């Protein structure tokens, strides 16, 4: 009896869902003709929830890369797990390799797709009031970093967990940011990599995202926008260059990304909270602006560790920060605290 590997459709989806229609072709365009052919087969199979793609001509690592790239281009596909099973079947002297997918939401996929679109719409429609892409991305970043709980105990890495459960890991944060950006017509791609350890080696695997404003691309890491000590937002990794990100991130170059060389649109630069060279006068202006805006918790970035050390010495060892507070008009500040983050060259100020 001849043995055949049969790929069956476990769920029939006649129409492409609105969630999967929000997409980019960035990764696909980096592939050669054979890679694009496999990418397209993966796409057709996933949209129909077919069990597998048979007869692939790549090894397991390259199949996983192309599959991951497909999910990167289609962040709204939440009903399939990010990992594949690579299956080899021997028929006589012939071996056939297949990609096997692992699906979720089998019982209520059509209903869950509608729920997903509705949940996303509840937030995305608020973005329509803004006509500036930087502001739109700022609100997306702020929403994810402030309201979504980060939990390594949560296994779902898709957007579903972020919008339905309010919980996610870095993949969910990145894909949600990308999806919302694409909805607004802002080009966006996912970045694969690792956190960088203090000794420069690879840390835990990590995903973040890039988006295009005008003619330039920028890095965003909404997962690292969450502070561990309270519920405030850290904009250190908002709208940054690759050079800046590589201080704390390592990029997996198996997944090509656009060049990003500009830091002039970072949150610190736009909000005038970046210090190239420390001076008491310059910091006093930043403090006065923060108090005027009502920002009782704010972050200042420095060009180097030495400049941040100078600021710490002057402000908190010599207690000049207290003198600055006394000089503010109508400022009722009873206490303050500060935290230094050497990895991101930033200082967080909390005033009460």
Segment roles from a protein language model:
Residues 106-107, 146-150, 168-170, 195-199, ...:
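Solvent-exposed loop/turn segments at secondary-structure junctions
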Residues 172-244:
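Hydrophobic/aromatic-rich core segments of domains that either
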Residues 159-173:
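A short, highly charged nucleic-acid-interacting micro-segment common to nuclease
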């Amino acid at each position: 009896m001849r043995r055949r590997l049969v790929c069956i459709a476990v769920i029939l989806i006649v129409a492409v869902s609105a969630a999967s229609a929000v997409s980019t072709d960035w990764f696909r365009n980096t592939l050669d003709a054979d890679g694009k052919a496999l990418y397209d087969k993966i796409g057709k199979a996933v949209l129909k929830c077919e069990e597998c793609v048979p007869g692939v001509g790549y090894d397991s690592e390259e199949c996983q890369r192309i599959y991951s790239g497909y999910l990167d281009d289609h962040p709204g596909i939440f009903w399939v797990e990010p990992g594949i099973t690579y299956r080899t079947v021997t028929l006589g002297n012939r071996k056939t390799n297949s990609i096997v997918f692992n699906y979720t939401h089998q019982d209520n996929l059509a209903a869950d797709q509608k729920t997903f679109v509705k949940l996303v719409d509840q937030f995305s429609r608020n973005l329509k009031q803004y006509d500036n892409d930087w502001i739109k991305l700022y609100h997306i970043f702020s929403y994810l970093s402030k309201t979504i709980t980060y939990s390594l105990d949560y296994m779902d890495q898709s957007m579903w967990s972020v919008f339905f459960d309010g919980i996610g890991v870095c993949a969910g944060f990145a894909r949600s940011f990308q999806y919302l950006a694409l909805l607004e017509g802002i080009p966006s791609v996912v970045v694969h990599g690792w956190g960088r350890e203090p000794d420069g080696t690879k840390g835990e695997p990590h995903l973040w995202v890039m988006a295009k404003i005008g003619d330039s691309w920028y890095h965003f890491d909404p997962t690292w926008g969450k502070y561990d000590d309270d519920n405030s937002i850290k904009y250190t990794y908002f709208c940054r260059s690759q050079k800046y990100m590589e201080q704390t991130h390592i990029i997996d170059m198996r997944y090509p990304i656009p060049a990003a060389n500009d830091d002039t649109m970072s949150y610190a630069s736009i909000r005038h909270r970046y210090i190239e060279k420390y001076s008491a006068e310059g910091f006093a202006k930043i403090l006065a602006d923060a108090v005027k805006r009502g920002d009782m918790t704010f972050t200042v970035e420095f060009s180097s560790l030495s400049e941040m050390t100078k600021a710490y010495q002057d402000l908190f060892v010599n207690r000049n920060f207290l003198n600055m507070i006394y000089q503010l008009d109508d400022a009722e500040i009873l206490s303050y605290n500060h935290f230094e983050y050497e990895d991101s060259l930033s200082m967080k100020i909390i005033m009460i």
